[in-house]
């Protein structure tokens, strides 16, 4: 039987079409450094570390935010398909107009006073998470002429130590901007589909919100691309 090798699904440090990588990609070979005990110890997140309301990004204001409300569910799994419980998941995103409430965001789009675009949730004992939000809008960026970022949600995952933080992005099915987005295209072809959520109407709320499902795998041949 021929030996098989796992397919690398993670983006390279340098992807010239994504201009920021030209500045931050390492110019020399990486040097492996053994982690210190402080980096590998803790945190252990208790069940009450995050309040339930922090996973609902639509309840920060005095009224509902503008945009297409959605419910996003999924599981955090290891390479053997086992759940990763009590992992801290942080999310952040633009509002429905494609605007971040950040001083460096100069996109000529309105802010939504009822939407801050950030939240967090702890996975349960089965590795499950649930986030309520609005679908983010696309927005222009100056990476290349006529550049627009597709709708996406940023994810940050914390394991059982601060040295185990992983960052990635989730995208939406059928978005035509994916084909011209250098960040998405920097991911090897085998990994791109792993970054796209599935429409799952049963997870939505009748006449209120669409449902999406997106599972994350932290290691192994089915790993979700990280560093996106």
Model-based region annotation:
Residues 1-228:
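Beta-strand-dominated extracellular/periplasmic modules and repeats
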């Amino acid at each position: 039987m021929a030996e098989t090798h796992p397919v690398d699904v993670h983006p390279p440090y340098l992807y010239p079409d994504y201009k920021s990588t030209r500045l931050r990609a390492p110019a020399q070979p990486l040097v492996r450094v053994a982690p210190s005990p402080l980096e590998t110890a803790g945190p252990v997140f208790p069940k009450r570390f995050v309040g339930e309301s922090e996973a609902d990004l639509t309840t920060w204001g005095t009224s509902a935010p503008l945009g297409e409300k959605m419910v996003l569910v999924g599981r955090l799994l290891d390479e053997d398909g086992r759940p990763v419980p009590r992992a801290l998941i942080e999310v952040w995103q633009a509002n429905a107009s494609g605007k971040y409430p950040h001083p460096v965001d100069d996109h000529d789009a309105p802010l939504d006073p009822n939407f801050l675009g950030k939240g967090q949730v702890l996975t349960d004992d089965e590795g499950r998470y649930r986030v309520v939000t609005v679908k983010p809008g696309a927005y222009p960026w100056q990476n290349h002429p006529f550049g627009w970022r597709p709708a996406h949600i940023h994810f940050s995952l914390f394991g059982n130590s601060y040295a185990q933080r992983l960052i990635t992005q989730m995208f939406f099915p059928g978005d035509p901007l994916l084909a011209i987005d250098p960040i998405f295209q920097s991911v090897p072809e085998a990994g791109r589909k792993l970054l796209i959520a599935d429409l799952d109407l049963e997870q939505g709320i009748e006449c209120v919100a669409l449902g999406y499902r997106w599972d994350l795998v932290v290691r192994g041949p089915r790993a979700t691309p990280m560093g996106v």
